[in-house]
From Swiss-Prot:
<keyword id="KW-0711">Selenium</keyword>
<keyword id="KW-0808">Transferase</keyword>
<comment type="similarity">
    <text>Belongs to the SelU family.</text>
</comment>
<dbReference type="InterPro" id="IPR036873">
    <property type="entry name" value="Rhodanese-like_dom_sf"/>
</dbReference>
<dbReference type="Pfam" id="PF00581">
    <property type="entry name" value="Rhodanese"/>
</dbReference>
<dbReference type="InterPro" id="IPR001763">
    <property type="entry name" value="Rhodanese-like_dom"/>
</dbReference>
<dbReference type="GO" id="GO:0016765">
    <property type="term" value="F:transferase activity, transferring alkyl or aryl (other than methyl) groups"/>
</dbReference>
<dbReference type="GO" id="GO:0043828">
    <property type="term" value="F:tRNA 2-selenouridine synthase activity"/>
</dbReference>
<dbReference type="GO" id="GO:0002098">
    <property type="term" value="P:tRNA wobble uridine modification"/>
</dbReference>
<protein>
    <recommendedName>
        <fullName>tRNA 2-selenouridine synthase</fullName>
        <ecNumber>2.9.1.3</ecNumber>
    </recommendedName>
</protein>
<comment type="subunit">
    <text>Monomer.</text>
</comment>
<feature type="active site" description="S-selanylcysteine intermediate">
    <location>
        <position position="97"/>
    </location>
</feature>
<dbReference type="InterPro" id="IPR017582">
    <property type="entry name" value="SelU"/>
</dbReference>
<feature type="domain" description="Rhodanese">
    <location>
        <begin position="14"/>
        <end position="137"/>
    </location>
</feature>
<comment type="function">
    <text>Involved in the post-transcriptional modification of the uridine at the wobble position (U34) of tRNA(Lys), tRNA(Glu) and tRNA(Gln). Catalyzes the conversion of 2-thiouridine (S2U-RNA) to 2-selenouridine (Se2U-RNA). Acts in a two-step process involving geranylation of 2-thiouridine (S2U) to S-geranyl-2-thiouridine (geS2U) and subsequent selenation of the latter derivative to 2-selenouridine (Se2U) in the tRNA chain.</text>
</comment>
Length: 364
């Protein structure tokens, strides 16, 4: 076990999806964590705040003493049992705190007293975070090919089929548009960046990588924004544009936003609450672009959406949604994307239907 006492090969740890028992406070974990980490705090948020205040006013020794008073007795035992259970579940795991300092060492010592020798990450989360940032910058220097196309062109599916494809929207838990949110909440910015870095490292390690294949995205995907080093490279990258018939795009959008999202909401929350959540999801997506539509047009499309929802609820048919989706594409989404694409016209290297783009990618 001695060779695992302190881990410094941070890239290997990230590549292996190494389980991390993260003993930072919940607020720290929410602000940024590594994939595969579970949060089992040594101190809760209020306890950490009290210790921090004590440290500023009375110094390190007083703060340490306060920490031991706050985490003692039954509280200490409950947390110790949770760490023991986590290590038994993940015997190849590591303890991790902010910088590999007192918190992970204290938990390590308490576990050792029970006969468990759990190694820790030297440098803690901060060291892993810096490794992730550096890896993203380094790997973003490789050539990039973008997949473009109007909403409903099947771009994400095409990216997912590529061995060198990186599903940015999947990593962000958002499909990019005002209707793009999923049932899984988005990660914090730092956690998204960490997850992206690990994905890049894994794909790069699996093959001799000539280039990345990414979807043509804006600066932000929902609440997450792309790392600037990657965004700068994407702005200069060649683009293959999917140009599918409008009717085919509508069918993809029907399946994704009306059939699948309805299923996901009702599966998660039950029929009644799921239907309410699904309805609110569609209304929220339309509301988010009300100013760009103009308030009168927004009101008209909202009325049409209400009628479509009533029809879907009574008959199960999603046909009524086409009455607001078609004008939304024609008046808003398609003109917006085409305007953005025109500014990058010099970067376009191929155009064609979905299957032609897929075949072209294979030939590259």
């Amino acid at each position: 076990m001695q060779d695992r006492q302190k881990a410094q090969d941070y890239r290997a740890i990230l590549l292996a999806d190494t389980p991390l028992i993260d003993v930072r406070a919940p607020i720290e974990f929410e602000q940024g964590a590594m994939p595969g980490a579970i949060n089992l705090p040594l101190m809760m948020d209020d306890e950490r705040a009290a210790v921090g205040t004590c440290y500023k006013r009375q110094g390190a020794d007083a703060a340490l003493a306060l920490g031991h008073r706050l985490v003692c007795g039954d509280i200490r035992q409950q947390r110790l049992e949770a760490w023991k259970a986590a290590y038994q579940r993940f015997p190849n795991g590591y303890l991790c705190c902010a910088r590999g300092g007192q918190r992970s060492h204290i938990v390590q010592r308490w576990l050792q007293e029970t006969g468990i020798d759990c190694p820790l990450i030297e440098g803690g989360y901060k060291a892993l975070r810096q490794t992730a940032i550096q890896a993203t910058w380094q790997l973003a220097q490789k050539p990039i090919l973008l997949i473009g196309g109007c909403t409903g062109s099947g771009k994400t599916q095409l990216v997912r089929q590529q061995p060198n494809g990186v599903d940015l929207e999947g990593l962000a838990r958002h499909r990019g548009s005002s209707f793009g949110r999923t049932l899984n909440p988005q990660l914090s910015q730092a956690s998204f960046e960490n997850k992206l870095a690990v994905e890049l490292l894994k794909i790069n390690a699996r093959q001799t990588l000539k280039r990345w294949v990414l979807e043509d995205e804006g600066r932000t995907i929902g609440a997450n924004h792309l790392p600037e080093c990657l965004r700068e490279r994407m702005a200069q990258a060649p683009i293959a544009v999917v140009e599918d018939p409008f009717a085919l795009r509508l069918e993809r959008l029907r399946e994704e936003y009306f059939i699948r999202m309805h299923h996901d909401f009702t599966h998660a929350y039950g029929d009644e609450a799921g239907w309410q959540a699904y309805s609110e999801y569609l209304h929220h997506g339309l509301f988010a672009i009300r100013r760009r539509l103009g308030l009168q047009r927004f009101a008209e499309l909202t009325d049409t959406l209400d009628r479509a929802l009533a029809e879907q609820l009574s008959s199960g048919s999603t046909d009524g949604h086409m009455a607001w989706l078609v004008p939304l594409l024609n008046e808003y989404y398609d003109p917006m994307y085409r305007y953005q694409l025109e500014k990058k016209a010099a970067n376009i290297v191929f155009r064609g239907p979905w299957q032609d783009v897929a075949n072209w990618l294979k030939a590259q």
